[in-house]
Amino acid sequence: MSKARSQDEVGWKRNESLCEYSMHRSRRPIQEKSIQSRAEHNFTLTRAYAINGSMTPDSSNLHHSSQVAVGRDAEGSANTLNTPFSEACFSQLISDGARSYLDFDFPDETIPGTSQAKNTEPDHQASGLQNQMSCDSLRNNTIMLDWLDLDYDGNLRQYSTAQLYGLLGADAHNGSAKCTLSLLPERMVADKAEAKLLLNHKMYGLTALCKNADRGSRRQQAVWEKVEVLLSSKHQTCVSDLLRKVDSSGEHQSLDLTSLPIEKLVQRAFRELGGLNLFIKEQDVTRIQERFLDPEKLPVDVSDMSLLITSLAWGALLDPEKLQRCYFARMVAFLCLAEKTGSDNLPALILGSISTAASLSLHLETALRKSCVSNDQAVQTKRAMWILYCIDKSYALRWQTFSLVGDGSLPTTNPPDTALPSEVATTLSLEWLRIRSQYSKICSNILQLGVGAEGEPSENRSNRAVVLSAALEEWYGSVEISQMMLSLEHSDAVHMKLQTSYHYYEARFQLLSISLPDPRSSSPTGSQECREVLRRSIREVITGSNTITSEYLLQDCNHLFIQTLALSMLALDILLESDQGCGKENRALLSIVAGFFARVDIILPQSSIFEEVSNLIEILTYR
């Protein structure tokens, strides 16, 4: 028996009360007998979960870091890895064939015989795998939300969203306690993953056109290498990451919350169109703030602290009631903030929000009503589902990946358009949500066109692209958008115009990358029409960059991306020229782009995007 164990090199230990597992990685592929049947491991996202115990760790027992909350079925028996995150991951891995998660490689596992010392303490033996597959764990007095993802090399790796425990410090002086908050960037856990989602799919359309335009030349290769860097998800600018590096000196390691204009920050966050005022109430975060700053109150829970932190960062105000529904609202709030800042955790937050909504069956009216204690909460949850839908479609369109939220995942066919009696300033936000939902449906159709573009006849593909182009033009020039801009103040109207134009041009560029014919095609007329539309779109985006203020650049990373995308399309258009030259108009556009990114470099000196842009412009202009 010991011989068989040494052959498989797999140790399995289970504790029924804690659902603990221990696995030692095999140096050889797992034998065929370890592969489980597909039906046995085919998890479903729509399963309801009952969390055993509180998500907040017991502060009196901080040394027991191996204790985590695990999924349990209705009867109370512990399930293997049944959490929304893990089931979403494994259900995708088993879609094409049965494969046991025993086959995966765990790089953080200690292997006997290596230079690492083998720890034989019982606590370490029992926590080998659970620390890698926990949905909520405690590390160094820090509460972590962890999940698993599959790397490009086929290995499961662990990722963490943020450290939410241990952020508070109390400086006792003369009998009074002073609440301080450690500098957020220093407490955030950056995503260390090197593999990004489906980058090759993002590059496919433009790469093919570029290669056909200037096949094999050194100039083309140099240009496309720079374009790949600028457009890759790995090199996208994350505003929060850059601000983190600006000043990390020791004298700024803590922040006195009482010195912040908390009320002003919250009120400003709730004024933003289509923001968190759709599904969160402003007075809820005010109550959390008062409870946190009042020395007579009990310590604030970790979950409430995360709500306050998010509200100060962007106004992510969450429901303080201890309901499952508020966990979904919290994740959508983080998702909104991640979209604005360009966080590389965005795909993980999308997946987490979707799996949480599915586990709570929020797409079903009866289940949604059961999860909410009032009609107001039910309406806010429906809005949050639609916000998740819109963000998912925009992300899928940008990186040409598959969309995770379908129309059947929504509780209603259209976003709720009725303002609640307690709401005052959400009417315009509701209008903006309705406008963006219409755009998201167009994105879904563009994605379907892109998926079938390779095997579809060019004539059918062009006809479908024309129909989608007309729908996009109708949306951009709709009466709803015009009327909404007239009802806004000047600054808000400018901000909304930028947002709608960015959505429009990003979808336009995606349609052009699909419908642009091969330069060697026998249909020069159609090709010329697409080229004219491409040039006009590039010109409008680049010349409009002077309307983007420095404040806007720090508030939304999409300002940077759309200008980067326009520059990349301009590089493609220059390479498509038969004489491989750079005309007068193109030189002028390149100069405007250089000025825009020079301004970005001044605002965000830690960013390397200006250097990359300068190198690309030099290649296009002088080589």
Swiss-Prot record:
It comes from the Eukaryota. Residues 110-129 are annotated as: Disordered. Gene clusters encoding host-selective toxins (HSTs) are localized on conditionally dispensable chromosomes (CDCs), also called supernumerary chromosomes, where they are present in multiple copies. The CDCs are not essential for saprophytic growth but controls host-selective pathogenicity. The lineage of its organism: Eukaryota, Fungi, Dikarya, Ascomycota, Pezizomycotina. This is AM-toxin biosynthesis protein 12-2. Pathway: Mycotoxin biosynthesis. Keywords: Virulence. It comes from Alternaria alternata (Alternaria rot fungus). Induction: Expression is up-regulated more than 10 fold in toxin producing cultures. Part of the gene clusters that mediate the biosynthesis of AM-toxins, host-selective toxins (HSTs) causing Alternaria blotch on apple, a worldwide distributed disease. AM-toxins are cyclic depsipeptides containing the 3 residues 2-hydroxy-isovaleric acid (2-HIV), dehydroalanine, L-alanine which are common for all 3 AM-toxins I to III. The fourth precursor is L-alpha-amino-methoxyphenyl-valeric acid (L-Amv) for AM-toxin I, L-alpha-amino-phenyl-valeric acid (L-Apv) for AM-toxin II, and L-alpha-amino-hydroxyphenyl-valeric acid (L-Ahv) for AM-toxin III.
